[in-house]
Amino acid sequence: MRSGTLRDVSSPGAALASGVSAGFVSGVLIAGVGGRLAMLLLRVTSDPALRGFLTDDGFTIGRVSVETLFLLGVTAGLGMAGGIFYLVVRRWIPARWRIPLMTLFFALVGGAGVIRPSEVDFTLLAPLPLAVALFIAIPAAYGAMMTWMAERLLREDSILRRRSWAWIVGLAPLAFANIVGIAVLLVAFGVWALGRSAPGLVAAWRSQVATRFGRAALIVMAVTSGAGLVRDGLDILG
């Protein structure tokens, strides 16, 4: 890649690296480590006979094993996906509301995705209110931390912009995603190239109409997920 091209992609590359890095770190720490700590707490508060019991996700309650490392890999991948998603929707959200709204959004969407009345985590573990609260709090905390980190990494004086190559290091977590990470880079490069060749598309994407549609889509996702979360939560708590 020529130096001119490298300079051209450094700004969008740093933006992508911000979402990837923030999502990776938040996914591993909050969803991965935090999720295991939540399960440890629930093991302590639940029937001791559940130790060694397999959950619906294939993980062993109360035991650190190879499955735990796999879980960290999964949460890292999901975290990066969430960080990239945030980059897409970020401009639709007023700056001062980004952290609280993303915290709420991920609490609803993430909670609805995790909490299922038929799963072991929400039938055998006790107390059930604590289990429900923990698995809503974890995606909420992820949303808060990821957004906070991404906003700081997106600043002009962030560590990803202090050197011309720093953003490349910020994209390194994509290596954990193997072929998916390569696909993300190819799609991102394609979007960047399309934006350079068709500035009208960029203007349309940044228009008020697109912003309204984007906000409406986020609201629909949050409301739909929230309704499902309330329904499943009430079903679990009986």
Language-model features: locations:
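Juxtamembrane/disordered regions of integral membrane proteins
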Residues: R2-G238
